[in-house]
């Protein structure tokens, strides 16, 4: 999912209260920012957004909404550039000003609330920020906005210890909205279909998972390359059919994976489906924390093979649960010269009590 809300278009700086027709250092810096947006250089976008915000402080009144819109631009640019801590601070500033200017439940708050949630570690506060955004979207009577916020919430919490049935239901509800509001080949709907299929597969509700994953494969088959979600759907169906003892059907999907055309000739392996490990009940009760470092091979079909514990802290149950979780992860495989190849991956799973 995208980091920002495509349905909102809340970056309002294109509509300044003050005219920008007269050349000034600020107007030139803002033009440079807009030009950078058209390119692919995230670092340049962040740099020009910061300059526009800096000069905007001398151009607009301190309580101007235009100034805080510039700060939202900066926060988003920093987030896209991987500078989460700095982005989070700016998102929080925007939230405070927007609440004063628009009200506590204004739709303008959705974008900075989501941004603030996405740029912080898993915590109760992160969950609360997502829930605030959902509540506002629900009141806005904008179904597609609500569906997008629900999917962002699911994606933001699915691989954390705050993943609950309620968070799972956000994805299911988003899928139902997309199914009613968008055509079958719409990307947002396809992504939701993929995730709901994965959820149903994880719950071993294979009769519901299979048609969803088959639909993903069908819709992506029109592309002239193999999308990561299509590959992951094939991989999950291999697992489902093997579990059901239907090896013939499983083999069909294995063959399909082997004949796929990569979306990049030198595509690195990429995680497509990750489940958070279970927190051992006895450890949680004792508020015991820890971590487990592991390495493993992502094979040509995107499955995790031969996981090995490199180091751990906190207890054997953390190690045991980490290994169980890792084996359920799915990747898009690495491609070299257009062919899938095994790749070595290292990860660290952390267990923290909030």
Q: What label would you give each PLM region?
A:
Residues 299-335:
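A short, well-structured alpha-helical segment
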Residues 36, 71, 78, 113, ...:
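Residue at a conserved register position within TPR or TPR-like alpha-solenoid repeats
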Residues 21-69:
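N-terminal leader/linker segments that initiate helical-solenoid repeat arrays
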Residues 323-354:
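Short, positively biased Gly/Pro-containing turn/loop motifs at secondary-structure boundaries
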Residues 60-68, 102-110, 140-147, 182-189, ...:
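Helix N-cap/loop-to-helix boundary motif
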């Amino acid at each position: 999912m995208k980091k920002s809300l495509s349905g909102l278009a809340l970056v309002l700086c294109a509509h300044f209260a003050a005219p920008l027709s007269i050349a000034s250092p600020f107007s030139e810096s803002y033009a440079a920012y807009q030009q950078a947006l058209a390119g692919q250089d995230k670092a340049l976008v962040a740099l020009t957004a910061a300059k526009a915000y800096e000069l905007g402080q001398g151009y607009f009144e301190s309580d101007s909404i235009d100034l805080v819109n510039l700060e939202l631009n900066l926060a988003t640019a920093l987030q896209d550039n991987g500078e989460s801590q700095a982005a989070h601070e700016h998102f929080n500033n925007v939230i405070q000003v927007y609440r004063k200017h628009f009200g506590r439940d204004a739709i303008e708050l959705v974008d900075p609330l989501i941004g603030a949630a996405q740029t912080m570690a898993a915590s109760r506060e992160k969950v609360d920020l997502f829930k605030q955004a959902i509540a506002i979207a629900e009141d806005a009577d904008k179904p597609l906005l609500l569906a997008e916020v629900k999917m962002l919430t699911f994606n933001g919490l699915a691989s954390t210890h705050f993943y609950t049935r309620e968070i799972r239901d956000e994805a299911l509800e988003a899928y139902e909205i997309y199914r009613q509001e968008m055509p079958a080949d719409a990307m947002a709907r396809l992504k939701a279909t993929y995730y709901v299929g994965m959820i149903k597969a994880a719950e071993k509700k294979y009769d519901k998972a299979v048609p969803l994953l088959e639909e993903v494969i069908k819709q992506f088959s029109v592309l002239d390359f193999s999308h990561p979600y299509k590959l992951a759907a094939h991989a999950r169906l291999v697992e489902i059919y093997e579990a059901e003892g239907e090896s013939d059907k499983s083999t069909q999907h294995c063959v399909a994976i082997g004949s796929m055309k990569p979306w990049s000739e030198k595509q690195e392996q990429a995680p497509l489906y990750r489940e958070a490990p279970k927190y051992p009940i006895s450890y949680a009760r004792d508020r015991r924390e820890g971590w487990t470092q592991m390495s493993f091979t992502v094979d040509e079909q995107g499955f995790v093979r031969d996981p090995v514990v490199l180091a751990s802290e906190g207890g054997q149950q953390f190690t045991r649960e980490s290994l169980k979780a890792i084996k359920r992860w799915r990747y898009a495989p690495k491609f070299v010269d257009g062919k899938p190849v095994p790749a070595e991956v290292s990860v660290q799973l952390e267990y923290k009590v909030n």
